[in-house]
A protein has these predicted regions:
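Structural preference for solvent-exposed beta-strand-turn elements
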Residues: 1-352
């Protein structure tokens, strides 16, 4: 590429064209804060695998928010800490998290998903990659994310704002789990999509006895998968499109864990985690209501038990104090009675 008379010369094979300044920008072109520098001899000391980072981006970008009124959730969070570079994305219904080995300091930045489009493909062709963070702007907490390859340097200034505390949204306790082939599961879900005749189609999943059973809610179809299963027999309903997307991103063998029919579910594969909210059904609503009432009764019973324990402790303390008082009285020797002196009583004096 060569600048000539304020135009950009673009050569592709035998074709050559010229673009004037701002000619490629339209009314709907979104603004960007990305700086791109191209150099055929960019010296790069790699600190992360280019292909590994490209795969990580492809696994988190699909789960950023599409709505313009949620700009923070339209970003991918990059956070380097404790020898890991963690990429996080969320859209309010799903949360994707993946951690890569990274031992080159600490930092974090929020980068818009629009600025990251095409970066994964560029990284697949790069031989070396380096990720770093640097201070930017006037604020003390302003940060920029820098990605260097042997040809190009990308620099994104972090968007201002606080990302949700995603760690609290990842479930840690489960009552049922299954380990199965994600590719076979995608085929099973696609076979159930045909009788649904709709883009939005729910899928009921139940696993136990070494099988994962997928079915349409109206019993129009059912598919079974061999799997390693454990725990209780719980049925959960997921959006079919969300389920297929989750399985494709996980790829290979996937672990699927659930707590109950209304709590967040967890897909995991080789360090990658995807949290997906289930669809609410009448059964799930009833179970949630029953669980809330049970927890309320348990909390009430624990409060009563605690109050009784406190009362019992007070009673025991009072009895112990009385016993100690009696023992102290017994230790005192009786003193002989002495005659008491009579006190003089003064007559009242009249005041004029």
């Amino acid at each position: 590429m060569r600048a000539t008379d304020k135009k950009l010369k673009v050569a592709c094979g035998a074709n050559t064209g010229y673009l004037a300044d701002s000619q490629w920008i339209g009314d709907k072109t979104p603004p960007t804060l990305c700086d791109v520098r191209v150099s055929p001899n960019n010296s790069v000391k790699p600190n992360i695998g280019a292909g590994e980072l490209a795969e990580a981006l492809n696994r988190v970008l699909p789960f950023t928010a599409k709505e313009d009124n949620r700009p923070i959730l339209q970003c991918v969070k990059f956070a380097a800490k404790d020898g890991k570079l963690t990429l996080v994305s969320a859209d309010g219904f799903r949360l994707a998290v993946i951690a890569l080995d990274y031992d080159d300091g600490e930092g974090q930045a929020l980068v818009s998903r629009d600025d990251l489009k095409g970066i994964a493909n560029a990284l697949k062709r790069a031989k070396r990659a380096r990720v770093s963070f640097e201070r930017s702007g006037d604020s003390l907490d302003g940060m920029s994310l820098i990605l260097d390859t042997e040809l190009i340097r990308y620099k994104w200034r972090s968007m201002d704002g606080s990302y949700p505390a995603y760690e609290e949204l990842i479930p840690t306790e489960f009552n049922a789990f299954a380990h199965f082939d994600a590719i076979e599961a995608v085929k099973a879900v696609n076979s159930l999509k045909v009788p649904a005749f709709s883009k939005a189609y729910p899928i009921d999943l139940t696993f136990g006895n070494g099988k994962v059973v997928m079915a349409n809610p109206d019993d129009k179809g059912q598919a079974e998968l061999n799997a390693d299963t454990g725990g209780e027999a719980i049925k959960v309903r997921l959006d079919g499109g969300y389920l297929v997307q989750a399985l494709k991103v996980c790829g290979g063998m996937v672990d699927f864990k659930i707590t109950n029919s209304y709590s967040p579910t967890l897909f995991s594969s080789n360090g990658y985690q995807l949290v997906a909210m289930p669809m609410m059904t009448s059964e799930a609503s009833e179970q949630a209501k029953a669980d809330r009432e049970a927890k309320a009764k348990q909390a009430e019973a624990e409060a009563v038990t605690q109050a009784e324990a406190v009362a019992q402790a007070h009673t025991e303390a009072a009895v112990l104090a009385d016993e100690q008082g009696d023992e102290a009285t017994e230790d005192i020797e009786p003193v002989a009675d002495k005659p008491r002196r009579k006190r003089k009583v003064r007559e009242p004096v009249a005041v004029a």
